[in-house]
Amino acid sequence: MKKAILCLLTVLPFTAGAQFFNGIGITVGATAANQKFMYRDPALVSKKNYVFGFNASVMAEMTSYDYVRWVSEIQFNQKGSVDKREEGSYANRLQYLSWNNYLKIRYELYSFIPYVLVGPRLDYTLTQATSSPDALGSYQPLHLSLAVGAGAELISYSRWKLFAEAFYVPDVMPAYTAPNLHITNKDFELRVGLKYNLHENRESCNTPVYVE
């Protein structure tokens, strides 16, 4: 009896952990990014032109509730801007590694699952190649941004699930700080992904049931 209880106590945490993780996946996509230069003296806001880049991530989806999930991911992203002036254009290009966490609110339909995503991103500056005369210093190593997005996942009988997502991501704290200048990033992202469900497909509360 003691051996049975000990075995049960050993297995339960692993079983609970396996049930907690619902799926794992990858995404790839494109990013359109720009920056806002906010000067203090004189008070002035200058919005810069867009640059285009690449993004990719590995993600995990946790919990198996019908309407609410938690998504956590590690993402590589390219941001920056083009600073156009009378004397010429200055490119600012930055590469980030981000830890993203989203609340995912979903609703299953017959052939696909629409959902919305919202949550914080912790952005780590990997590299910077900036040439704006007013911002020649180093960007912050870490800063926060907020992601708001929407997506759709195709329903299939396989454990492999295709999905597509779009995000709007503004900074909630400056990515660059100097005595007379703060810079924030903003970007729009489009991406596609492939997710592998760790558990067998099951009927949700919205799956139609046919009775003869």
Which residues does each PLM region occupy?
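Gram-negative (and chloroplast) outer-membrane scaffold detector with strong preference
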Residues: 30, 36, 59-131, 156
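Cleavable N-terminal export/targeting peptides
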Residues: 1-21, 198-212
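Membrane-embedded beta-strand positions of outer-membrane beta-barrel proteins
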Residues: 24-28, 56, 72-74, 101, ...
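Outer-envelope beta-barrel architecture signal
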Residues: 20-24, 66-70, 110-116, 142, ...
